[in-house]
Amino acid sequence: MRGPIDRITAPLPGAWRTTVDWVLTIVIAVAAVLAIKQWVVNPYRIPSSSMEPTLHCARPGAGCEARYSDRVLANRFIYHFRDPRRGEIIVFDTPPKAVQQCGAGGTFVKRLIGLPGETVREDDRGNLYVDGKQLDERYLDPERKREDSGNPGTWHVPQGEYFMMGDNRAQSCDSRRWGAVPRDNIIGKVFAIYWPPQRISFIR
């Protein structure tokens, strides 16, 4: 049985048919890759230290140079079927206020802390509470947590929005400064580190 490409190219002479076969194959492959990036999985580079120690921006002492930063994959499809969950690392477009507060905006990667309608509180020791219950944040570096202990505050998360924070709290410009993130701004869930080779792993 002939496939779609065979049916298109059958009337052509041999040499031309081979050329058209290759062109059609490349076009289909490119279209498939673009569709996957748009709707299923997309790669991102970690440009800062705001998610240390979970996601690295560079080798120790090297600064956040592009060739050393973690590259991650985000599942763009999952949130079409369910809502984001607390503790997930999420890729999202920042609200406009982020540019004013942080000097930068665009696409950020942070951890989801507060869900719609909840109240998030950070005490003077860097502990987080959601609706009065302390979060178990084993993913934090204790030393970095102590560095952030001088920034207590309380924030209410509006309906339809999500409160995002970096794991490296003292070096993270996040929802504490520019507010919660609307549901429509959320792009996807980070599920894996794919570069550099020694850092390849899945993220729960």
Give a label for each model feature.
Residues 1-31, 35, 39-204:
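Soluble "head" domains of membrane/secretory-pathway proteins
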